């Protein structure tokens, strides 16, 4: 209660033992009842899950060339997601990604406002490109293309209280 926004769907998945539909519905209802918005940052969790499978997900990313060389090095050599990779972690993060998609669907069904966010800077999450990825993932999770676009424009401006000046296309 009394949180205006939860940024990162993982804040909910950390409080779920089963990643169940019932938990997704419960979290959506709790958020709706308390006026809490969601910025799921699906792209960050997808990149994290990919890295538990292989560091090649970053090495082979076409967007890596747009990242500063020092950050590239950190992502490739000091990457705890890749270093701690195991079949159990792969399964855990893959299941978490699917739960986050379910959360978005249930939050939408409950009428909870969803705003786009990316957590740019997480290994593999490249500013700019990641917003495009996030919009696509929001559609995959059940938002319409218009709802996804609104999540990055009008709803974001409403959240900031500046929708009279910006946020419309």
At which residue positions do the language-model features occur?
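Functional cores that coordinate and move charged inorganic groups
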Residues: 1-6
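Short, acidic/turn-prone active-site loops that include or flank metal/cofactor-
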Residues: 9-15
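Active-site neighborhoods of metal-dependent hydrolases
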Residues: 15-137, 141
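Surface-exposed patches in mature extracellular/periplasmic domains of secreted proteins
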Residues: 40-41, 116-117, 146-151, 166
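Acidic, glycine-enriched loop/beta-strand segments at the rims
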Residues: 98, 126, 144-149, 157-169
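Buried hydrophobic packing segments
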Residues: 134-135, 153-156
